[in-house]
Swiss-Prot record:
GO terms for cellular component: plasma membrane; proton-transporting ATP synthase complex. This is ATP synthase subunit b. NCBIfam families: ATP_synt_b, PRK05759.1-2. HAMAP family: ATP_synth_b_bprime (MF_01398). The lineage of its organism: Bacteria, Pseudomonadati, Pseudomonadota, Betaproteobacteria, Burkholderiales. It is a single-pass membrane protein. F-type ATPases have 2 components, F(1) - the catalytic core - and F(0) - the membrane proton channel. F(1) has five subunits: alpha(3), beta(3), gamma(1), delta(1), epsilon(1). F(0) has three main subunits: a(1), b(2) and c(10-14). The alpha and beta chains form an alternating ring which encloses part of the gamma chain. F(1) is attached to F(0) by a central stalk formed by the gamma and epsilon chains, while a peripheral stalk is formed by the delta and b chains. Keywords: ATP synthesis, Cell inner membrane, Cell membrane, CF(0), Hydrogen ion transport, Ion transport, Membrane, Transmembrane, Transmembrane helix, Transport. The gene is atpF.
Length: 156
């Protein structure tokens, strides 16, 4: 093997190039790669954090929806109870009003019956007086008396 000056010159140039690359070219490349790696890691961490926040938000939304459903069902149940109570109150009021109207109608009917009886008594008394008057005006014989009673009976 033949070693000559060209080989040494090439070795020196190679070593200078290697030193220059290590000193000036390699650090910016390493920094760029490190920055890129850091950006990728930050992006992945942000994606994981976003995914975790999204999952937490989904859980909160599900809980709030469940709570809203429960609240809605509770409000519906309360409204049904209030409606039932109002219906019962209206029914009780209607029954009381019906009982009052029936009692009032019975009282009015009773008053009318009493008035009719009094009027009938007055008429019967007048007819009895009239019949007695007619009997007393005529002779007292059996056939005339029977005829007058039949006539009074027909008038009643």
């Amino acid at each position: 093997m033949n070693l000559n000056a060209t080989l040494f010159a090439q070795m020196v140039v190679f070593l200078v190039l290697a030193w220059f690359t290590m000193k000036f070219v390699w650090p910016p490349l390493i920094n760029a790669l490190d920055e890129r790696s850091k950006k990728i890691a930050d992006g992945l961490a942000a994606a994981e954090k976003g995914k975790a926040e999204l999952d937490a938000a989904h859980k909160r939304v599900d809980q709030e929806l469940a709570q809203a459903r429960n609240d809605g069902q509770q409000r519906i149940a309360d409204a049904e109870k209030r409606a039932q109570a109002v219906a019962e109150e209206i029914k009780a009021n209607a029954q009381a009003e019906a009982a009052r109207i029936v009692a009032q109608a019975k009282a009015e009917a009773e008053q009318q019956i009493v008035k009719a009886r009094e009027a009938l008594r007055g008429e019967v008394a007048a007819l009895a007086v009239k019949g007695a008057e007619q009997i007393l005006k005529r002779e007292v014989d059996q056939t005339a008396h029977a005829q007058l009673l039949n006539q009074l009976k027909a008038e009643l």
